């Protein structure tokens, strides 16, 4: 039987000949066939925008191609990356859970170790995840992954599941969200079926629970999870848990669960640095067979710094815009479309002036002077731009802060820096760095 991956590669080859290159690259190329059974092909796409367009414009074509390739009538089901994760493998149970049959998974096909970009901020979490995938129930049990939204926790958890299922296709690998665990528990209580609930979860060879922070305040759920954890741990089965914060920082979490989570390894994932963000974009482009100029990668990576989802979302928008508009992939073309978010923290004008002067290795008096030297003039323009971004001061007040400059000078400076950051990556990176320093200074407690 042809695997989903091979079947989808054949389908992509056919679709590429029937669609224009911009349409194929934008709407079809990055999709993944994640399961095929009972005449239903489940295809995962990047986001809801792509999903809606595919349903309206290419649904019949997808069904036709897959029907021709398989020799059976195929119905297409489209889902996005945001699909609620469900149990993967499990024996039949009278408990009415939405389990997936053996050898079929609800995993994101892209969330594998080979597609995970390792950097300084996630290296330990990656190494620990790979270690438990290779040798579960030993050194790091449980493994507790913690970090902010969109930093790769779910990617690593699903990569572990992929790895185990590839090595042992019949293994009972359960990957569920805390909400799913809770809902299954509620169903079992309502139907007086706790025995099946406990049997199901405690029979796992490998249990991965996502978003455990949502267990707070749910006393009975915590009670059941505690006993499930103990049962699996005592049997030498691996448990992996993910949360947006460390166990000790989850409010309302029972002390005994904090103790259990802390007995293994707590691996923190931080926001990726610039080099890692660039590597993430480069790898995504390579997998999607898209050529990205280095300056575009640098621009996106320097402007989207909070998490990987935003980073990849910006890349998708850039690709969609250039493909649909039939324009070249350049910083000048994508900058107005992306309109990257800038997190601003209010700061005192004097603080901004000091930070800018230090960066350009100038004395504050030089920065506020009327000097027309190029380096002084540029630093002053940058300072005015940042003061407009990080304060509520009017243009005349900003001019006063910079030694009594005219408001038209401030307006010209802000416009010039706005245009320059869209054309020059170094300027863009400088502004990002200075804004970050200003944010930190603005958040510092007053002494």
From Swiss-Prot:
Region (Domain I, interacts with DnaA modulators): 1-79
Biological process, per Gene Ontology: DNA replication; DNA replication initiation; regulation of DNA replication
Binding site for ATP: 150, 152-154
GO cellular component terms, semicolon-separated: cytoplasm; plasma membrane
Localisation: Cytoplasm
GO molecular function: ATP binding; ATP hydrolysis activity; DNA replication origin binding; lipid binding
InterPro entries xrefs: AAA+_ATPase (IPR003593), Chromosome_initiator_DnaA (IPR001957), Chromosome_initiator_DnaA-like (IPR020591), Chromosome_initiator_DnaA_CS (IPR018312), DnaA_C (IPR013159), DnaA_dom (IPR013317), DnaA_N_dom (IPR024633), DnaA_N_sf (IPR038454)
Keyword ATP-binding: yes
Keyword hit for Transmembrane helix: no
Region of interest (Domain IV, binds dsDNA), ranges: 323-447
Origin: domain of life: Bacteria
Pfam families referenced in this protein's UniProt entry, alphabetically: Bac_DnaA (PF00308), Bac_DnaA_C (PF08299), DnaA_N (PF11638)
SUPFAM superfamilies to which the protein is assigned, alphabetical: P-loop containing nucleoside triphosphate hydrolases (SSF52540), TrpR-like (SSF48295)
Stored CDD domains: AAA (cd00009), Bac_DnaA_C (cd06571)
Main localization of the protein described in the UniProt heading: cytoplasm
Domain III, AAA+ region, as annotated region: 106-322
Domain comment quoted from the record: Domain I is involved in oligomerization and binding regulators, domain II is flexibile and of varying length in different bacteria, domain III forms the AAA+ region, while domain IV binds dsDNA.
Family per similarity comment: Belongs to the DnaA family.
Subunit structure: Oligomerizes as a right-handed, spiral filament on DNA at oriC.
Protein name: Chromosomal replication initiator protein DnaA
Natural source organism: Synechocystis sp. (strain ATCC 27184 / PCC 6803 / Kazusa)
Gene this protein is translated from: dnaA
């Amino acid at each position: 039987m042809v695997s989903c991956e091979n079947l989808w590669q054949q389908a992509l080859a056919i679709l590429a000949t029937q669609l224009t290159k911009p349409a194929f690259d934008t709407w079809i190329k990055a999709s993944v066939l994640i399961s095929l059974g009972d005449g239903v092909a489940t295809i995962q796409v990047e986001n809801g925008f792509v999903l809606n367009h595919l349903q309206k414009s290419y649904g019949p074509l997808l069904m036709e191609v897959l029907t021709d390739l398989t020799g059976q009538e195929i119905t297409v089901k489209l889902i996005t990356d945001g699909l609620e994760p469900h149990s993967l493998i499990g024996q039949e149970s009278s408990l009415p859970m939405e389990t997936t049959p053996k050898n079929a998974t609800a995993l994101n096909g892209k969330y594998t170790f080979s597609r995970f970009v390792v950097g300084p901020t996630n290296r330990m979490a990656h190494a620990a995840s790979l270690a438990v995938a290779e040798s579960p129930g030993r050194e790091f049990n449980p493994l507790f992954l913690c970090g902010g939204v969109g930093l790769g926790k779910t990617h690593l958890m699903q990569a572990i599941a992929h790895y185990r299922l590839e090595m042992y296709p019949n293994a009972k690998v359960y990957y569920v969200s805390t909400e799913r665990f809770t809902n299954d528990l509620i169903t079992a209580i309502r139907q007086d079926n706790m025995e099946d609930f406990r049997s199901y979860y405690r029979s796992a060879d490998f249990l991965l629970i996502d978003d455990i922070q949502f267990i707070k305040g749910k006393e009975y759920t915590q009670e059941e999870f505690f006993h499930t954890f103990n049962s699996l741990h005592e049997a030498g089965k691996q448990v992996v848990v993910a949360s947006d914060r460390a166990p000790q920082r989850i409010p309302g979490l029972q002390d005994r669960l904090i103790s259990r989570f802390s007995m293994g390894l707590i691996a923190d994932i931080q926001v990726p640095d610039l080099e890692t963000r660039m590597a993430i974009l480069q790898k995504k482009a390579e997998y999607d067979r898209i050529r990205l100029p280095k300056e575009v990668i640098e621009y996106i990576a320097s402007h989207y710094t909070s998490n990987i989802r935003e980073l990849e979302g910006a890349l998708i928008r850039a690709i969609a815009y250039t493909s649909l508009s039939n324009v070249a992939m350049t910083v000048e073309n994508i900058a107005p479309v992306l309109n990257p978010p800038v997190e601003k923290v209010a700061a005192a004008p004097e603080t901004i002036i000091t930070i800018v002067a230090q960066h350009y290795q100038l004395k504050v008096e030089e920065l506020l002077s009327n000097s027309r030297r190029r380096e002084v003039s540029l630093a002053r323009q940058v300072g005015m731009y940042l003061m407009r971004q990080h304060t509520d001061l009017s243009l005349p007040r900003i001019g006063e802060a910079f030694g009594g400059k005219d408001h038209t000078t401030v307006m010209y400076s802000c416009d010039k820096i706005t245009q320059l950051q869209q054309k020059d990556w170094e300027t863009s990176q400088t502004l990002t760095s200075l804004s970050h320093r200003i944010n930190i200074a603005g958040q510092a407690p007053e002494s």
